[in-house]
Design a protein with these regions (language model features):
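Active-site neighborhood of thiol-dependent amide/isopeptide-bond enzymes
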Residues: 121-206
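His-Asp-centered catalytic microenvironments across diverse enzyme cores
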Residues: 145-146, 178, 186-195, 199, ...
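Secondary-structure boundary elements
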Residues: 2-160, 245-248, 255
Length: 271
């Protein structure tokens, strides 16, 4: 008889250690958080501790515990009920399914709501199939609109029904993560053919990353209007908030964020 799986067995120790370090630095802030964690299940409490251990200080100060609880509870539910999610490498699950932040967007509860809205549409699908279907759902709910305001939260993009590419990709990444599909935003800070930039989405399945245009569904992965443009880009990068980098080439840091070079997936590169 197989032994029961242990939630985050490989990373439990470092999560606890990093959480305690954060709490030591901000004792007055973490005292009420610790009280609320005692009322959670062991798995949900550990998921919350991961979020608090690696989130920016601004998130700790700006948002109540209940916001992060939504992300933690949804992540644990997916891990318990979806074998595909439970089989993910822990670092992929932590960074690209559980984690609440995508880029510099506002944070608001959304994961449980998105899962209830999308869940029936992807029943029985693998990650590849689910990613395509989720993107169709995202296209039904939001379309492109150029704005210069601060990046909205995923739920705000959903309610407003539109957003610029950075907001569409934040929305799509959250929708994908809400149903257990590992996802992240990637960004080309400057096109070579014009004075502009673009953000889109990558999903992880079968041990590899694939791309798609946020709210721009295609019938296959690795296809988008930006395919040719990205092949001439000077840089395409993703962001990770954890200090233990899942994989990839580190090209720099910005505060507690690490930038990873993703250009080789789109263009011919040379070491």
């Amino acid at each position: 008889m197989a032994e029961p799986r242990v939630f985050l067995k490989e990373n439990r120790g470092r999560i606890e250690e990093n959480y305690l370090e954060q709490a030591k630095n901000l004792p007055r802030v973490f005292a009420p958080v610790d009280e609320k964690l005692q009322k959670c299940t062991e798995e949900v409490a550990l998921a919350c501790k991961y979020l608090y251990a690696f989130m920016p200080y601004s998130d700790i100060g700006n948002y109540p515990f209940e916001v992060f609880l939504d992300y933690a509870e949804n992540g644990v539910k997916l891990w318990k009920e979806n074998p595909q999610v439970a089989d993910l490498p822990e670092e992929i699950f932590l960074n690209y399914v559980l984690f609440h932040r995508v880029n510099e967007e506002e944070i608001a509860q959304c994961r449980t709501y998105f899962r209830t809205e999308i869940g029936s549409r992807i029943q029985g699908m693998n990650f590849r199939e689910a990613a395509l279907e989720v993107n169709y759902w995202c296209a039904e709910e939001a379309t492109y609109h150029c704005t210069d305001d601060r990046t909205l939260s995923a739920i705000s993009v959903y309610r407003r029904g539109n957003g610029r590419c950075g907001e569409e990709s934040v929305f799509t990444v959250n929708a994908l993560r809400s149903v257990g599909v590992p996802a992240r935003q990637v960004y080309a800070p400057k096109w070579s053919h014009c004075d502009d930039n673009h953000a889109w989405v990558e999903i992880w399945c079968d041990g590899k990353w694939y791309f798609l245009g946020a709210c721009e569904p295609e019938e296959i992965l690795n296809k988008g209007w930006f395919t040719n443009a990205s092949s001439r880009a000077m840089m395409i990068h993703s962001r990770v908030f954890d200090t233990k980098i899942p994989e990839g080439e580190v090209i720099g840091t910005d505060g507690m964020v690490t930038m990873l070079n993703e250009l080789k997936r789109y263009a011919v590169t040379k070491e």
